[in-house]
UniProtKB/Swiss-Prot annotation:
<feature type="region of interest" description="G3">
    <location>
        <begin position="582"/>
        <end position="585"/>
    </location>
</feature>
<feature type="compositionally biased region" description="Low complexity">
    <location>
        <begin position="400"/>
        <end position="411"/>
    </location>
</feature>
<dbReference type="Pfam" id="PF22042">
    <property type="entry name" value="EF-G_D2"/>
</dbReference>
<keyword id="KW-0963">Cytoplasm</keyword>
<keyword id="KW-0547">Nucleotide-binding</keyword>
<dbReference type="Pfam" id="PF03144">
    <property type="entry name" value="GTP_EFTU_D2"/>
</dbReference>
<feature type="region of interest" description="G2">
    <location>
        <begin position="558"/>
        <end position="562"/>
    </location>
</feature>
<feature type="region of interest" description="G1">
    <location>
        <begin position="533"/>
        <end position="540"/>
    </location>
</feature>
<feature type="compositionally biased region" description="Acidic residues">
    <location>
        <begin position="279"/>
        <end position="322"/>
    </location>
</feature>
<dbReference type="InterPro" id="IPR005225">
    <property type="entry name" value="Small_GTP-bd"/>
</dbReference>
<feature type="binding site">
    <location>
        <begin position="533"/>
        <end position="540"/>
    </location>
    <ligand>
        <name>GTP</name>
    </ligand>
</feature>
<dbReference type="Pfam" id="PF00009">
    <property type="entry name" value="GTP_EFTU"/>
</dbReference>
<feature type="compositionally biased region" description="Basic and acidic residues">
    <location>
        <begin position="183"/>
        <end position="196"/>
    </location>
</feature>
<dbReference type="InterPro" id="IPR027417">
    <property type="entry name" value="P-loop_NTPase"/>
</dbReference>
<dbReference type="InterPro" id="IPR015760">
    <property type="entry name" value="TIF_IF2"/>
</dbReference>
<dbReference type="InterPro" id="IPR036925">
    <property type="entry name" value="TIF_IF2_dom3_sf"/>
</dbReference>
<keyword id="KW-0396">Initiation factor</keyword>
Amino acid sequence: MATKTKDFQEKKLFQVVRELNVSEDRVVEFLEEEGYEEALSGSGLNAKIVDEEAYLVLREEYADDAEVAARIRELRSEEDDGGPERDEVATLDEEQAAEPESATETAEEAAEPAVADDEEEPRASGDAAPEAAPAEEDTSDATAPADAEAEPSGDEASAEASADDAPADEAPTDEAETAPVDAADKDAAAIADEQKQAAQEPDAEADASGQDTGEETSDTDAATEADATDDAEAESAAPEPTEAEPETPADETEAEDVSADKETASAEEADDHASDEHAPDEDAEAPEEPTEAEGEADDTTEEETPAEGADDAADDEADEEGETLKAGRYRLKGPSVVGKMDSDQLQRPDRKRKRKDKDKDKDKSSKKDKKDKSNKKSKSKGKKQKGGGGGGPDEEDIEQTLQETLQELEQGASRERQRRRRRRRKRHEEERQRRRERKREQENILEVTEFVTTGELANLIGEPVSDVIDTLFDAGMMVSINQRLDTETIEFVADEYGYEVEFVAERDTQAVEVEEDDPEDLEPRAPVVTVMGHVDHGKTSLLDYVRNANVVAGEEGGITQHVGAHYVELTDHDNEAIAFLDTPGHEAFTAMRARGAKATDIVILVVAADDSVMPRTKEAINHAQAADVPIVVAINKMDKREADAEKVRAELADQNVLVEEYGGDVQSAEVSAKTGDGINELLDKVLLQSEIMELKANPNREASGVIIESRLEKGRGNVITVLVQNGTLETGDPFLAGIHSGSVRAMFNERDNRIESVGPSQPALVLGCDGSPEVGDQFVVMDSEGEARDVAQERQRIHREQELRRQSQVSLDQVSRQMAEGEFHELNLIIKADVGGSVEALSDALLKLKTDEVAVNVIHSGVGAITESDVMLARASDAIILGFQVRPTSGAREASQREEVDIRTYSVIYAAIEDVRDALEGLLSPERREETKGRAEVRDTFSVPDVGMVAGCYVNEGTVGRNQKVRLVRDGVVQYEGEISSLKRFEEDVSEVQSGYECGLSIENFDDLKVGDELETYVIVEEARELEV
C-alpha cells in the first residue's frame, strides 16, 4: 500500500523518466508489476510518484540506466566546455614536444622551403585529436610498435636530414642542450620511436577527417628530398625564411600527393636507415623553439578556416607564449603516450565524450569533403604538426568506443546485486500474492452479527434493499426493511449473492468505555477473596467464624444458595479489611462459581481434612486457574480425629496444586472453623498474598463494579448486590447494569445497615434498578439517568430479539426420527425464584436433563413471586410452575385451582431437580423385554374339524399358558412366532399346563406342525426406565 511520508517530495513522472533514462511506459509497467499501482497519481504531464518506497525501488531497478544517463550528460557538458580546455591541453603538449618538433621543422625547411606554411597546426584538425586520443589509446598502443617499424613518417625523415647540418645560431636552444650526450641520445631515440608510432595511425581515422592524403604527401616529399640532397645543401637551405614563401596552390599539392604515393614504397628503407643514423644528432638540435613562421602560419590558417577561428585564436596565444617558454625533456614511457599527448596528465572524466548520432558524423564528413582544398591543406599540415605525422582518432572510433562502454555499463551489474534484486522481487511478489489472497477472501466473507436487519444486510453485500426483499419473497419469505433476520435467512441471502457468512459477537454500539486511571491517583485497596470448595466442607462456617455471626442458621438445608458478599475489618490485623465472596458448593451453581472467580483477587480453597478432593473441589481449582487467580488452601475440620492433612496435600498435588510443603508456591493453612484454630494464620497468608499483588484503585472517580446478586423484595422492589471495583458509589448516582438502568435510591451493607457511599472492594445492596440484571453484568455509573436509560433500552431491544430467535426448534429430520421411534415428550416449565442467580442455576440444571425422547422446555423464568399471569401462561402452554424460595400470590393460587395448573415450590434447589427428573422418567416409554415361561415337545399331530391341526405335546420345562406367546423351532431354526389359540388336557380347556404333563394345543393361523418340533412360550415384560443424562 502506498504511503506518503512527510519528508518525501513528490516526483513528476517525466522528471523520473529523464533521470533514469527509461521510457514512461516502462516505468508504469514496472510499478504495476511490483504492486505500486497506487504510488502513481495523475495523468499526462501531471503524473507523479507520491510513494517514497516506489521511487527508491525504481532507482535501484534502473540504477544502470541512470548511471548511463548521468555519464551522457557529463559528456555533453564536457563537449560544450571542451574547446578552451582541449586547446590548453594541446598547447601544453606542443610545448613539451617542442624539441623533436623543432628538429623536424628544420629538416623540412631545408628540403622544401616552399611549404613552410604547412607546418602550422590549425585548430580545426586539432579538435578531435586531443579528445579522441584517450579513447583510441588501447588501439594505438597495440598497433604502434609494428607499424612504426614498417612505415617511418615523413617528419622523421626530415628530422634526420636536418639534424646534423642545421647551424646552431638559426634557432635558440634551452638548457637541455647542455645535458650529457648519452642522455640526449636516449631521449632522441625514444622521441623517434614515439614519432614512428604516432605516424602509423589507422588510415580510416585519417580518412574520417579528410586530412591523411595531405599529410602523407608532405611527409613523403620531405623524406625523399632529404635523402636526395647532401649535408651541405640541407645546411644552406635551412636558414631560408619561411615567412616570404607564398602559399602552395591546392592543385600543386594534389600533384605532389600523387607523386609522393609512388615514391613512398621505395623510400621506406632509406627512411629507416636515416632515422637510425641521425637520431642522436636530432636530439642535440631538437630543443629549437617555434619560429615566427609558425605564428604567421596560424594567422593564415585562421583566415582560411573561419569556422574554427576560436580554436585558432587560442592556439595563437599559446604560440606567442611559446617564444619565451622553454620545454623540458622527459622520457616517453611506451604505450601510455598517444601521439604527443600524455594520457597520465589527463583526468579520467576527460575521456568521456558526448555521444553523437552516426548521421551527424556522416553529414560532418561530407561537409569536410566539400571544403576548400586550401582549407584541407591547412588542416593536413596542422594535424601533421600536432600528431607528429600520424592521423588521430576519428568520430566513428569514438562512437564505437562509446557504444562498447555503454554496453559494458548496462551489463556491468554485479551478480550479488542481481541476486539481491531477484530476492527482493520474489519477496515483493509473495507479499502481493498474500495481499491478493487476503483481499479475495475478505471480499467474499460477510462478517455479520446475529439478527441483522434486511437493510443492514443489503448494505453489507452492496445490493439494493428491494432486490434482497424480492429474493426472500421468491423464496417464500415476506420481510420488511427493518425486520431482523435469523441466521438461516442471512446464510440463504449471502449464498444467493455468492458470499460466505461469518457470524461475530454482537457489537454493542452503546458500549460504555471506562477511562484508564493515572497511576498517581491509585491507592491501595482491600483484597476481594472468594471462598470456594465442595458441599459441606465448611466454607460458610469458616466465613461465619471470621464475621462472628451465624450465617448458616439462616440457610435452608444447611447449604449456601446465594452468593454472599461481606466486607470484614480485621481487628487483630491492624484494622485491615477483606471483602469475602461466599459461593455455593452445589453442582447447580457452576456459573456462580465461575463469576466469583472472575470478580475476585484471591481464592481460598476449602478442603475438608476428613474427606478428600471432591468433584466441586476440582471444579473450583479449574475456575481459579482459568481466571489466573492465586489460591490459598484452607484444610478445614482439623479438629476431627480422622483428619489427614497429608492426604489432602497429596491429592491437591495430583490436581497441579503444589503447596509450599511440597515445593510449590501455593500457601496452605490447617484450620478448624469450629474451634477457630489456624484462622489468624490463614488471614495472614491472605494479606501477604495481597501485598505481593499490590492491589490498587482510584476512589476519586465514578464507580464501576460487577453485579453479584439480584432479587425482588417486597417493599423494596429490585435489589441488586454490587461489588465496587473502582471509584466511589454514592446515593443518587445514575447507573447502567446490563440491560437495565436506574438511580441509586438507597444503599445497605451486608448487615442491612443503610450507608451513603461505598469505595473500592466494598459490596452494597443497591435499590433503584428498573429490573433484575443478570449476575455478572457490568455496573457503571453514567453522567445522567437519561443517558443510562437510552443505552439500556437499546440493549433490551437487541436482547429481546435475540431471545425470540433462540427459542429451541426441532429440525425436520429429528421430527421424522422421533415419529418413527415413538412419541416425543416435552415437559414445559415456568421457573420463578427469589434471586437471579438461583433462576439461572435452576434453569441450567434442568436443561441438562434433556435426552432424545424427553426434554425440559423453560418457556419463562423470572425473579419474584408467582403471579396470576404466570398461571395463565402455564395453562395455555400446558406447563408446570416451579417456585424456588418464592410463593404464589392469593390470586395466583385461586387461578391455579380454577385452571388446574400444578404449582410446586421448593426451598432446596436439588429437591426441585430430583422432582423434575422423576417427572421426566415418567414421560419415558417403558423398557420392553422378553421373559421365557416354558418349553414343550411335539410328539404327535392330528387334524380336528373346525379347529385345524392340533399338536400333542409334552411339557419339558416351565409352564405353557393360554395367554402366552409361542415360538416354533424346527431343527434349531425359528419357523413361526404367534399366540396359542387353544389349550386342552383330556378334552378340557385349561389355562396352564405344568412341566411333566401332556397337553394338546393349536397355534393361531398356523397348521404346519410336525413331530419333533420344539415350542417355546414367553411373555413381554415392560419396565420403567431411568433418566440417563
